[in-house]
Amino acid sequence: MAKEVFQRTKPHMNVGTIGHVDHGKTTLTAAISIYCSKLNKDAKALKYEDIDNAPEEKARGITINARHIEYETANRHYAHVDCPGHADYIKNMITGAAQMDAAILLVAADSGAEPQTKEHLLLAQRMGIKKIIVFLNKLDLADPELVELVEVEVLELVEKYGFSADTPIIKGSAFGAMSNPEDPESTKCVKELLESMDNYFDLPERDIDKPFLLAVEDVFSISGRGTVATGRIERGIIKVGQEVEIVGIKETRKTTVTGVEMFQKILEQGQAGDNVGLLLRGVDKKDIERGQVLSAPGTITPHKKFKASIYCLTKEEGGRHKPFFPGYRPQFFFRTTDVTGVVALEGKEMVMPGDNVDIIVELISSIAMDKNVEFAVREGGRTVASGRILEILE
């Protein structure tokens, strides 16, 4: 069956659901999908099971990898990533967050903000997300007086992490909206959320004029066609027939793009902001991996050693309880990848939680990097610092 061509009629935006495990992120994502499919006859409704689609997730009822769905409102086309809330999987949330222009923060009204609520807010801020909308979920299970307290608490948190005091708060029950899609009262919260997204989220300015770059998130083999690399185009435009370089981790090599797709539809060209799959000529699945980038030839190079400015989280923010010293070996997260690195300090003997400091890092493998790129520093499954590259040393 021939694939349909993706029609670019509305502005495209990437959003995602973030928040603590079991606060209802996947349920809300399913409720939105079902609601939009009722408005648009071409749209496909995805149920909870379709979004939570890995066997281990079904058994545990949690989302591990970020999942993508698409839907349209009156004004926009959204790609929506459902981010995992489980602590072990925050790493995957980072790659999900790296693809979002704006986020919907889910907080269960019956339990309020929890540790991961804070960690996700911090990650959203570090990943450059400027605006969020709060969805206060499980309203049917919460005492009305408690809801008011939770609302105040969440707004304080949102402001603490640099988001606006005017952040909209939508209240409702995602489960109610998902279970009763025909009932206007149940789906009112989803309708309000989508209107709020259209009005409050600013369409991002896309770096279409810069050289092409895509951070590889996943790699698949399609029998008879070759290898597909998926990810979000960070900048530039890509068309069939263009040559690209695979950079980072291994030797840099060239290949040609033989197909561009988004949500199983063919694209005439992929552009900055699109989540795409690129079919690559003559590349074996083992030749390319998550964490590498595809780029316009000669525009980005792999490096191991750099100078960076970092902020160390305090104990209260979920960071370390004790200082770290030269020789510290955490993981550094760039775009979609984590690499172990060794820290050297200049003119300092140690770094305390809460410090802003410049460090020198040497990674154990080369990563495609450029100046000003932001990264997260993680250790033992938690974020301990965030930083930005000041200069590349080698």
UniProtKB/Swiss-Prot annotation:
Residues 61-65 are annotated as: G2. GTP binds at residues 19-26, 82-86, 137-140. GO terms for molecular function: GTP binding; GTPase activity; translation elongation factor activity. Mg(2+) binds at T26. Residues 19-26 are annotated as: G1. One of its GO terms (cellular component) is cytosol. Residues 10-205 form the tr-type G domain. It catalyses: GTP + H2O = GDP + phosphate + H(+). CDD domains: EF_Tu, EFTU_II, EFTU_III. Transmembrane segments: none annotated. Keywords: Cytoplasm, Elongation factor, GTP-binding, Hydrolase, Magnesium, Metal-binding, Nucleotide-binding, Protein biosynthesis. Residues 137-140 are annotated as: G4. Monomer. GTP hydrolase that promotes the GTP-dependent binding of aminoacyl-tRNA to the A-site of ribosomes during protein biosynthesis. PANTHER family: ELONGATION FACTOR TU, MITOCHONDRIAL (PTHR43721:SF22), ELONGATION FACTOR TU-RELATED (PTHR43721). This is Elongation factor Tu. It comes from Borreliella burgdorferi (strain ATCC 35210 / DSM 4680 / CIP 102532 / B31) (Borrelia burgdorferi).
